[in-house]
Each structure stands twice: as structure tokens, then as C-alpha cells.
Amino acid sequence: MVNLCDLKKEPQINYPTFWDYKVIFEVHVKASEIFEEILGQREYKFKHSNSSASGKYQSYLLNVYVDSKKDRLDIFDKLKAKAKFVL
């Protein structure tokens, strides 16, 4: 059984670590260019993971080396500014 109090706590993440983001773009967006622009020389890799049934969206799994919580959240914010959705 899960203790509901534990669900409200922030998970403990040991940094530095690799972090996965699911990033969804409209189909005309070149994901590789966006990732390069945001991440530059940082260590990362990505792969196409899915396309929407309508063909309007494409999703990618992005794996990035992050140094801290602030670093992880900064990358999230930058991705969010360029992508349709970021998870």
C-alpha cells in the first residue's frame, strides 16, 4: 500500500544525472535544430518516438545530462518555449 504522505514529497534525485524529456512538436518543426539550439555542446541524445494519427504532431524522447535541479528545470523551460508539449 502507498502512503499518500510520501506522494506529496519531492523525489530525491542524485545529480549529475541523465534526464529524459518527452518533447512534442508540430510535424513541420525540425527537432534536431531546436535541440542543438537549446543544448549546444551539452551531452544529449534523442530519438523519434511517435507520430500522431492525424500526422500533425511528432514526439521525441530526449535524454540530457543535467548538473542540478535548476539546470533540469531551465532546460524544461527552454523546451517548453519551443515545443507544443514537454513531459
Curated annotation (Swiss-Prot):
Pfam families: DUF493 (PF04359). It comes from the Bacteria. To H.pylori HP0495/JHP0447. This is Uncharacterized protein Cj0253.
